Every structure is written in C-alpha cells, then in structure tokens.
A protein has these predicted regions:
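Tandem CBS (Cystathionine beta-synthase) repeat/Bateman regulatory domains
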Residues: 1-141
C-alpha cells in the first residue's frame, strides 16, 4: 500500500466577482461649462480662478459642441505674444476641440479605464440622451 502526501490542505480562495460598476457611480456632476461666444480671456480667468484644466462647451440648445483646455488657451496666449497684442480677444469657438469622444453613464467603469489607456485622454464628457450630465476623469477612476 502506497500513501501519498500532498502537503497541508489549503483552503480554496473564494472567487472574486467584480460587480458591474458604472460611470454614473464615479462621474462628476457639477461642471463648469463655457459658451462658444465667450472670449478666451474669460475662459482663462475661469480656469485659473477655479483651478481646473478645461471644460465642456455648450451651445444655446444646451448641447455639447466642444471642449476647451489649457492647451487651447495657451495657443491664444502665444498668438497674442507673437502679434504683440496683449488682448485675449479670441472666442472659444475659434480654439475649442470639436472632435469630442464621449461616454454614457451606463458604461462599465473598467471599459472607460481601458479607453483612457488607449486614447491618452484625461477626461470624457458623459452624455445621456444627447445631453451633458457629467464628466469622468482619470482621477475619478
């Protein structure tokens, strides 16, 4: 008769189930938005006062039409220095990014995390039925 020894019995670890965590659970709902006709001077002042890096641009119908960022503002500042015009008179619509990647509040947070890695973006506007309802950033995830 041969007896075999398999070592000390190990307790099986319970299976971990990742719950369906949505963007709505982590997104920011209180947003600072801008108007396409605002001056870049107003935007820069708001970004500095609120200590934010950018914001969504909403048209008169309340629909997302772009995003304005620190980088977009820098373009206006550099243009003013180059042409020796101290006024930041350009409009948001002249500098905003209009090709905006968005997500919806029901999306899985892990899917959005992968989008952050793949697209090299820092934030996504969250739209529900075509309306801006929030923003999800890398810091939120």
């Amino acid at each position: 008769m041969v007896k075999s020894y398999r070592g000390v019995a190990q307790a099986k670890s319970p299976k971990v189930v990742i719950q369906d965590v949505s963007v709505a659970d982590y997104m920011t709902r209180r947003l600072i938005t801008f108007d396409p006709d605002q001056t870049m001077e107003q935007v820069i002042k708001t970004l500095l006062d609120k200590k934010i890096a950018g914001g969504q641009v909403i048209d008169t119908r309340g629909e997302l039409c772009g995003i304005i960022s620190e980088g977009d503002c820098l373009k206006e500042v550099v243009k003013g220095k180059y042409t020796n015009t101290p006024s930041l008179s350009g409009k948001v619509s002249d500098y905003m990014s209009t090709n905006v990647q968005t997500v919806n509040p029901e999306m899985n947070i892990f899917e959005v995390a992968q989008m952050f890695l793949n697209m090299k973006l820092r934030r996504f506007p969250v739209l529900k039925d075509g309306k801006l309802v929030g923003q999800i950033s890398q810091k939120d995830v």
